[in-house]
From Swiss-Prot:
GO terms for biological process: cell wall organization; division septum assembly; FtsZ-dependent cytokinesis; peptidoglycan biosynthetic process; proteolysis; regulation of cell shape; response to antibiotic. It comes from Neisseria meningitidis serogroup B (strain ATCC BAA-335 / MC58). Keywords: Antibiotic resistance, Carboxypeptidase, Cell cycle, Cell division, Cell inner membrane, Cell membrane, Cell shape, Cell wall biogenesis/degradation, Hydrolase, Membrane, Peptidoglycan synthesis, Protease, Septation, Transmembrane, Transmembrane helix. The enzyme has an N-terminal penicillin insensitive transglycosylase domain (formation of linear glycan strands) and a C-terminal penicillin-sensitive transpeptidase domain (cross-linking of the peptide subunits). Catalyzes cross-linking of the peptidoglycan cell wall at the division septum. Belongs to the transpeptidase family. FtsI subfamily. It comes from the Bacteria. It is a single-pass membrane protein. The chain crosses the membrane at residues 28-48. This is Probable peptidoglycan D,D-transpeptidase PenA.
Length: 581
């Protein structure tokens, strides 16, 4: 029997389907294709670099050279007290080659032209370039700018230009002995260039650069070796170019006129000890020092010792007055006399002279008798105090200390001869400095080549009253009856002293070789300028200090007073001599 059921199966609800992200077959294909193309491009580029441009890139890489170039510090400028430039450094270029990198030598025509431009023989150039192991060899230093441009136009490979600085001396011979010169690397060799080297030089810098074969800088590279240069210090000297010019010209005229071996002049500021002028002849051009010999380069005013002759007498007279060993009224017997077997005499015999007469007539007898009133040790100490036998520390290299033998070794006659300038030696600059003890009211001043901002401290040698008395006595030397009338300057009272010394040659005093000296100051009451002149071995028109060194002294003193704007201290004569402005 068939039974019908009322049951109906119950339908379960449909599960909600989670939508999965759809991945596009097209997009996948695109990405894969892009990657494939990229790799294919890289492979192709690699093949291209290896096959097509390898030689080109290799050549470009070979053409790039990393170098560390010096950045030269600019050397300090040297100028006179008024700003006239005496030494300066200007940019220049130097040429070097890199033989190690050269694939082939320059052509014969290129070498010939290069030889003409740099003034180096072709054979020398070829020998330099054939040194294949070298990566640096100088061809020519410090080329003229026009020449450098012409060399660049040759297009030579592995020839490189290096920036440098070249020293120039605009005044040429005029300041040669004071300034000196540098070598080609800019290092001081003589004069103030040497003594002030540390101040003038500064500190070079460095820069790492990339150069091409022609030496052109392609790029500057960052490097811990890079350093900026520190320029040198500018120096202002005490010298006055106007006075220096005057002194140099008058000195040369005198040396030529008297057919002398050499000459020297020193001009000091009598109040400060500053050197206003210092000149020697013969001289040289510091721009071409290699053409000068040792005689031309020698700064005689500082390095050469001379016996001062009678120019030392004012100090002996001053010492006697200062110590109360004499006075202006005393008359001394000035007849010739002997010390042991050695005679002491004057050029002209005077029976007796007072102190003024001893100064005016330049009496050896009178001066030696004043010196004899002191012990040898006391006179030795006195000369030493004046700076004889002592370095001045002027700042100039090679300065002499002079010569003063120990008093214990003096023979009886030597104390006498020293009183009139024989047996002791000093430089002309030392002698001029000693005169500051008279011009600065008894105080010995230091000398300086650099301009002084503050008045220097000196050392007292005499009482102020003594210095003034001696200055007054020295005016008589340039007045009628004195030995130095040739040095008189119109409109001024000039205090001066002449000196004539026979030269010591081969162990004896020569009869025909002399040093003529004239030294003095003006105005006498309030001195502003000291001038000292020596003419070495005059052979024509006389040899006495007053005759030979007096005329250039007169011109230099008169001109210096005029240049400095110092007014005359007494009426001018009708025949007043015109002095340079």
């Amino acid at each position: 029997m068939l039974i019908k059921s009322e049951y109906k199966p119950r339908m379960l609800p449909k599960e909600e389907q989670v939508k999965k992200p759809m991945t596009s077959n097209g997009r996948i294909s695109f990405v894969l294709m892009a990657i494939a193309v990229l790799f294919a491009g890289l492979i192709a580029r690699g093949l291209y670099l290896q096959t097509v441009t390898y030689n080109f890139l290799k050549e470009q890489g070979d053409n790039r050279i990393v170098r560390t170039q010096t950045l030269p510090a600019t050397r300090g400028t040297v100028s006179d007290r008024n700003g006239a430039v005496l030494a300066l450094s200007a940019p220049t270029e130097s040429l070097f080659a890199v033989p190690k990198e050269m694939k082939e030598m320059p052509s014969a025509a290129q070498l010939e032209r290069l030889s003409e431009l740099v003034d180096v023989p072709v054979d020398v150039l070829r020998n330099k370039l054939e040194q294949k192991g070298k990566s640096f060899i100088w061809i020519k230093r410090q080329l003229d700018p026009k020449v450098a441009e012409e060399v660049k136009a040759l297009g030579l490979e592995n020839f490189v230009f290096e920036k440098e600085l070249k020293r120039h001396y605009p005044m040429g011979n005029l300041f040669a002995h004071v300034i000196g010169f540098t070598d080609i690397d800019g290092k001081g060799q003589e004069g103030l260039e040497l003594s002030l080297e540390d101040s003038l030089h500064g500190e070079d810098g460095a820069e790492v650069v990339l150069r091409d074969r022609q030496g052109n800088i392609v790029d500057s590279l960052d490097s811990p070796r890079n350093k900026a240069p520190k320029n040198g210090k500018d120096i202002i000297l005490s010298l006055d170019q106007r006075i220096q010019t005057l002194a140099y010209e008058e000195l040369n005229k005198a040396v030529e006129y008297h057919q002398a071996k050499a000459g020297t002049v020193v001009v000091l500021d009598a109040r400060t000890g500053e050197i206003l002028a210092l000149a020697n002849t013969p001289a040289y051009d510091p721009n071409r020092p290699g053409r000068a010999d040792s005689e031309q380069r020698r700064n005689r005013a500082v390095t050469d010792m001379i016996e001062p002759g009678s120019a030392i007498k004012p100090f002996v007279i001053a010492k006697a007055l200062d110590a109360g060993k004499t006075d202006l009224n005393e008359r001394l017997n000035t007849q010739p006399y002997k010390i042991g077997p050695s005679p002491v005499r004057d050029t002209h015999v005077y029976p007796s002279l007072d102190v003024r007469g001893i100064m005016q007539k330049s009496s050896n007898v009178g001066t030696s008798k004043l010196s004899a009133r002191f012990g040898a040790e006391e006179m030795y100490d006195f000369y030493h105090e004046l700076g004889i036998g002592v370095r001045m520390h002027s700042g100039f290299p090679g300065e002499t200390a002079g010569l003063l033998r120990n008093w214990r070794r003096w023979r009886p006659i030597e104390q006498a001869t020293m009183s009139f300038g024989y047996g002791l030696q000093l430089s002309l600059l030392q002698l001029a400095r000693a005169y500051t003890a008279l011009t600065h009211d008894g105080v010995l001043l230091p000398v300086s080549f650099e301009k002084q901002a503050v008045a220097p401290q000196g050392k007292r040698i005499f009482k102020e009253s003594t210095a003034r008395e001696v200055r007054n006595l020295m005016v008589s030397v340039t007045e009628p009856g004195g030995t130095g009338t040739a040095g008189a300057v119109d409109g001024f009272d000039v205090g001066a002293k002449t000196g004539t010394a026979r030269k010591f040659v081969n162990g004896r005093y020569a009869d025909n070789k002399h040093i003529a000296t004239f030294i003095g100051f003006a105005p006498a009451k309030n001195p502003r300028v000291i001038v000292a002149v020596t003419i070495d071995e005059p052979t024509a028109h006389g040899y006495y200090g007053g005759v030979v060194a007096g005329p250039p002294f007169k011109k230099i003193m008169g001109g210096s007073l005029n240049i400095l704007g110092i007014s005359p201290t007494k009426p001018l004569t009708a025949a007043a001599v015109k002095t340079p402005s």
